UniProtKB/Swiss-Prot annotation:
Expressed by the venom gland. It comes from Gloydius halys. One of its GO terms (molecular function) is peptidase inhibitor activity. This is Bradykinin-potentiating peptide 2. It is found in: Secreted.
Length: 11
């Protein structure tokens, strides 16, 4: 499988 999705980091 590919890499897991990155968590959303707000600006």
């Amino acid at each position: 499988q590919g890499r897991p999705p990155r968590p959303h980091i707000p600006p």
